């Protein structure tokens, strides 16, 4: 009798133990402690991919890894939860304590994610600015021309042609190599005045040689010292059109005057040594000989008569 009573007492104890073990399920070889627990994210490191969630019922901190997030924000590139965000999760038993699993938002919604997590390219906050399509300008001009044609049907033909003018093209500056060719930069841009004499030109040339030469911006450039009057430069073929337009009649008149003046001075210098000044004694002798020669023919003519 006693043995039968003991066996009957052991059977309810075994049934109670089995009933207590039924809610404990496994999630990927981990024992589930609780399900659908609400908690607040204490902190989460996006770079390392882990953080802690504080349970609202027991005020216990639960470890959470980014792989445990079940429904992530579709706009975020990485899985994460934001600091102070309310989430819903399951508590499982890990190697070092309680861990969170199946982390979602309150209800079957995705989590908001951390503000430090990178967004996907398709969900940019400020999209890139793209220019108008290629045929946008042609379509715009065609629409404008159509509207103008409808409005100018009653207007004369002259006014219609004046309104439809092509847009002026923008002029860009020439490249650097055509603006300043190598080794052709003038040292001084001052033009001499017309009223200066030859001596003034020579003194000016000497003064320019005495001045310190301006350093050219090009490395390895050696200035060439000029001797004599400066030569007239021919206009550059690769110069700018604007520079040619700015050259007026004044520069041409200055150049012509300088060429004439230097020619006159040069001829004067060449002729000067050919006709030296005669001395006083030679002048008196020449005058006496000329007087004697003139008197002798006159006397011969008188005797003949």
UniProtKB/Swiss-Prot annotation:
Q: What spans are recorded as compositionally biased (Polar residues)?
A: 1-11
Give the UniProt entry's GO cellular component terms: nucleus
Q: Does the keyword Transcription apply?
A: yes
Bias type Low complexity, positions: 177-186, 194-210
Q: Name one GO molecular function term.
A: nucleic acid binding
UniProt feature, compositional bias: Basic residues: 123-132, 257-272
Q: Record keywords: DNA-binding included? A: yes
Record's keyword terms, sorted: DNA-binding, Nucleus, Transcription, Transcription regulation
Q: Which PROSITE patterns match?
A: CSD_1 (PS00352), CSD_2 (PS51857)
- In which residue ranges is the amino acid composition biased (Basic and acidic residues)? 273-286
Q: Where in the cell is it found?
A: Nucleus
**Start and end of every CSD domain?**
39-103
Give the protein's function: Binds the B box promoter element of genes transcribed by RNA polymerase III and is probably involved in the regulation of class III genes.
Q: Which PANTHER family match?
A: COLD SHOCK DOMAIN CONTAINING PROTEINS
Give the protein name, as stated in the record.
B box-binding protein
What organism does this protein naturally occur in?
Answer: Xenopus laevis (African clawed frog)
Lineage at the top is: Eukaryota, Metazoa, Chordata, Craniata, Vertebrata
């Amino acid at each position: 009798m006693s043995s039968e009573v003991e066996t009957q007492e052991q059977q309810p104890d075994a049934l109670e133990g089995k009933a207590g073990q039924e809610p404990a399920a496994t999630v990927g070889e981990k024992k589930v402690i609780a399900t659908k627990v609400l908690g607040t994210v204490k902190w989460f490191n996006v770079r390392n991919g882990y953080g802690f969630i504080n349970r609202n019922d027991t005020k216990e901190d639960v470890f959470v890894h980014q792989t445990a997030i079940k429904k992530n924000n579709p706009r975020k590139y990485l899985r994460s939860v934001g600091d102070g965000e309310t989430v819903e999760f399951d508590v499982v038993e890990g190697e070092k304590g309680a861990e969170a699993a199946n982390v979602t938002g309150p209800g079957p919604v995705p989590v908001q994610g951390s503000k430090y997590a990178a967004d996907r390219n398709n969900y940019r906050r400020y999209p890139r600015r793209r220019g108008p399509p290629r045929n946008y300008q042609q379509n715009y001009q065609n629409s404008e021309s159509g509207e103008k044609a409808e409005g100018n049907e009653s207007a004369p033909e002259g006014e219609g042609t004046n309104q439809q003018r092509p847009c002026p093209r923008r002029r860009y500056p020439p490249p650097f190599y055509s603006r300043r060719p190598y080794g052709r930069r003038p040292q001084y841009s001052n033009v001499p005045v017309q009223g200066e004499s030859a001596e003034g030109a020579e003194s000016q040339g000497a003064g320019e040689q005495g001045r310190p030469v301006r350093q050219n911006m090009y490395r390895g450039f050696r200035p060439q010292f000029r001797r004599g009057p400066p030569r007239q430069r021919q206009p550059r073929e690769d110069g700018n059109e604007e520079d040619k337009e700015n050259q007026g009649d004044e520069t041409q008149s200055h150049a012509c005057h300088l060429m004439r003046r230097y020619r006159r001075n040069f001829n004067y210098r060449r002729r000067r040594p050919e006709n030296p000044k005669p001395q006083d004694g030679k002048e008196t002798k020449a005058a006496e000989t000329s007087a004697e020669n003139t008197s002798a023919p006159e006397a011969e003519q008188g005797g003949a008569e």
